[in-house]
């Protein structure tokens, strides 16, 4: 059984997080998050073994292989899975936009998406959501 740690994702010293409503979900619920580390963090990942891997998995595998990261950008409402070349372009753009807002390298950003399969990301909402999420970063998450 997993032990719940008080303080959530920012319980460890030096981590900030935010969750915002970017408008991806029609319900109006929180649908984007950014998590950052003040210093370069050791990074690893566990990914699907399925032959069909969503674009964020492809992007994040490269980050995990390098073993170092400073941020994670997450969206819900759209999985960016089974979206072909456009999906890869969009997942890379999510990493690039997050890196740009944080002043770090694109290769230091994990990308994670969950939601409806077969639909491309609404990149206008993603881009503005990343800006909002970075502005809202806080040590109390």
Question: For each predicted feature, which ranges?
Answer:
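Alpha/propeptide regions of enzymes that mature by internal proteolysis
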Residues: 1-141
């Amino acid at each position: 059984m997993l032990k719940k740690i008080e303080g959530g994702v920012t319980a460890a010293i030096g981590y900030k997080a935010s969750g915002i409503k970017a408008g991806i979900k029609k319900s109006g619920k929180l649908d984007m998050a950014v998590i950052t580390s003040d210093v370069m963090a050791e990074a690893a990942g566990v990914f699907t073994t399925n032959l069909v891997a969503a674009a964020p998995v492809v992007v994040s595998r490269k980050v995990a292989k390098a073993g170092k990261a400073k941020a994670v950008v997450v969206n819900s409402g759209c999985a960016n899975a089974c979206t072909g070349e456009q999906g890869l372009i969009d997942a890379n753009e999510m990493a690039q936009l997050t890196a740009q807002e944080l002043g770090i390298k694109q290769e230091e950003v994990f990308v994670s998406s969950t939601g409806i399969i077969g639909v491309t990301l609404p990149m206008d909402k993603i881009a503005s959501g990343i800006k909002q999420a970075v502005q809202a970063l806080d040590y109390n998450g």
